[in-house]
C-alpha cells in the first residue's frame, strides 16, 4: 500500500523557500480542525505545548485532516525523544520544537525523529503512520520526509542562532514572539523595537544558513511585515482567536 504523505510536500516547499501561510489550531477539537483544513491554509499547527492536547486528541484531528491540502505540524510540549516517538507513530511528519537554545538541543530533536543509524527513534513495525504495517517502504522513506522546525524564544537561543540554524536536519527556524519578548524584558509587548529588531536578526541569520524562517503573527500588519523581512512560513491567526473575535463581535452587534 502507498503512503499518501511521501514525499512530504510541506518539507519540499520550505526547502524551495515557497511562502507557506498557516494557522494555529488551539481548540483541540476535530470539528474545528476539520474546518481549518477546508479553509486553504498551507499548514496548520496542532499545539501540544499551550493547548489541551495529547495523543487521544491528536489522533481524531489527524483523521479530520485526511485529504486536506493543509500540512499538519505538531508543536510538541517539550523536546523529549519518547514524546516525539509517540507523535511520529500516530502519523505526524512535521514537528515544531519549542525552546531550542543550543546546537545540541537541535541535534537531539533531529535524532529523535530518525531511525538508526541516523537517529534514535524506536522501531515499531505496526502503527498508524505506516498504516499498521502495510506501507512497504515506510522505513526507507521516513527519515528523509520528516520536517524539524525549531523555535528560538530565549536570549540563549538568539545567542546560538547561527549554530542552531546550521544544524543538519533542521528545516527551519521559528520565532516564538511572546516568549522572546518576555526573555528580552518586554513581557506582553512583542511590538517593542528591541523585540522586533531581534526577530529580524533571527530571520537574517536563518537566511544566511539557507534555512527558512517563520513566526506566528495574528495581526495582519505584523504578518505582512515579517513576510517582507523574508519569513516564508507564517501563521496568520488561530482558531481560538478567530472564534473569540467573531463571537464577541456578534454579541456586541445585538447587545450594545
Curated annotation (Swiss-Prot):
Coiled coil regions in record: none
Pathway entry: Carbohydrate acid metabolism; galactarate degradation; D-glycerate from galactarate: step 2/3
Record-linked Pfam families: HpcH_HpaI (PF03328)
Active-site residues annotated for this sequence: 50
Keyword list, A-Z: Lyase, Magnesium, Metal-binding
Binding-site residues, substrate: 151, 178-179
Residue sites binding Mg(2+) per the record: 153, 179
Full protein name: 5-keto-4-deoxy-D-glucarate aldolase
Originating species: Escherichia coli O157:H7 (strain EC4115 / EHEC)
Gene that produces this protein: garL
